[in-house]
Every structure is written in structure tokens, then in C-alpha cells.
Amino acid sequence: MAKDAITGARTRFGNQRSHALNSSRRSWKPNLQKVTVKINGAAPKKVYLTARTLKAGLKNGSIERV
């Protein structure tokens, strides 16, 4: 299973609850994107990042897309 290379985000599991509070298992998957980036000026590398991590990294300058 893939995970975010920076934050380590991966699939989370929990319960889906109906109006009657019946439960069934469900999962929440992160929005993973496979991108080629330079992280802190290192050599370009293909990694999985969540859209949220990618957006934040591009904004603060720690990630550069190649």
C-alpha cells in the first residue's frame, strides 16, 4: 500500500454509521499523486505525495516540481 513520502499518510480505517447507528467498516484514502519533485534541493525523485502535502510544500518552497 502506498503512503506519502513526507508525512507518511496512508489509508485510515473506521466505521460508517447509519441514522440508526448501525456500523459497517469503511476506509478513508489519502489523495496520493505520483510526482517528480526536488525535496529541499536534492536530486529529482519520483515519490507519492498527498495533494495537501504537495500544495503546502510548493507554497513554502521546500518542494520544487521537475
From Swiss-Prot:
Transmembrane segments: none annotated. GO terms for biological process: translation. This is Large ribosomal subunit protein bL28. Residues 13-25 have a biased composition (Polar residues). HAMAP family: Ribosomal_bL28. It holds the Pfam family Ribosomal_L28. The keyword Mitochondrion does not apply. SUPFAM superfamilies: L28p-like (SSF143800). Belongs to the bacterial ribosomal protein bL28 family. The gene is rpmB. Signal peptide: none annotated. Keywords: Ribonucleoprotein, Ribosomal protein. The lineage of its organism: Bacteria, Bacillati, Bacillota, Bacilli, Lactobacillales. GO terms for molecular function: structural constituent of ribosome. GO terms for cellular component: ribonucleoprotein complex; ribosome. PANTHER family: 50S RIBOSOMAL PROTEIN L28 (PTHR39080), LARGE RIBOSOMAL SUBUNIT PROTEIN BL28A (PTHR39080:SF1). Residues 1-26 are annotated as: Disordered.
